[in-house]
Amino acid sequence: MRLCLVLIVSLVLPSLSFGQLGGTSVFNGLNIQPSARVAAMGGAINAVVDSDIQLAAINPSLIDSAMSGSVMLSYVDYFAKTNFGNAAYARHINSKWNAAASLLFIAHGAMDQYDALGNNIGSFNAGEYALSLGASYKVDSLWTVGLNQKTFYANIAEYNSVALAFDFAATYHKPSKGFTAAFLVRNVGAQLKTFTPGTREKLPFEFQIGITKKPKYAPIRFSLVAENLQQWDLSYVNPNEANAVDPLTGELINDRKFQFGDLLMRHIVMGAEFLLGENIQIRGAYNYRRRQELGLTDRPGMAGFSFGMGLRIKKFHLSYARAIYHLAGPANHFSLVFKV
């Protein structure tokens, strides 16, 4: 037990730091959206207690006894040659404990390789893989806590790295009020093996709070998630554009001051699920930060919005999501849940 505590502390301390956004951390595949339902809700929904294994990888404290025997298979045909998928399984242990496991892959495909002079010298492959083991413990009728342990492996050509990370979660659920709140600390850990000797990089540590509310007589559930609370200022300015001028305002980009409302909204993901009976859900969400970072200034389009639906047919639960990241196109997410 003492050895376990020492290991966890040694992994936590390097993670409790700020400024890990905008490409300054490694293994961002740890933040990939594990299911179509999560993707439809803006990439962040963590406070729904309805025994759906699609949410277990995001919040381990949502694993419950009704998930026992559930299997989830997810697939996304992402941008360029990248695609990723996820498989998960949940099991009831006893009156207090439940567990789940998942396996994630991200395949980037073959890429052209060039030398320092720009000559094509062949191709190389890149991929990422994560094994997650999670458990939940029911404290009382209102509170459940959970833990995910994730082992991550990535390779780029001849370079590879291994990382170990933990997610800690707690969920408060009051069914009579239709209210749920969740608290998550994600990706607490460190690299066990670095890509290059002596170059240790940070994992994408994150603190989230999420709430959902379902009005008693309305077939809708509202979701609000505050993400990346470990860092207030999530605005991003490209350091390579030190003298760039905004074509609309004429301001120097690096001199731009972000307003309080803009900084606040970069933490917020809001969405809703329309519950059309027990077998159909229509989902939609808006991710403000995604729109600000990926939408074009003069033609943002639908960047930041995501939509989807869930359909139960006998023993199968099908989910689909269309997440719009950029004017270049959306990503289509598919998930299938069934029991064995």
Cite the ranges covered by each PLM segment:
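Subset of outer-membrane beta-barrel
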Residues: F18-V340
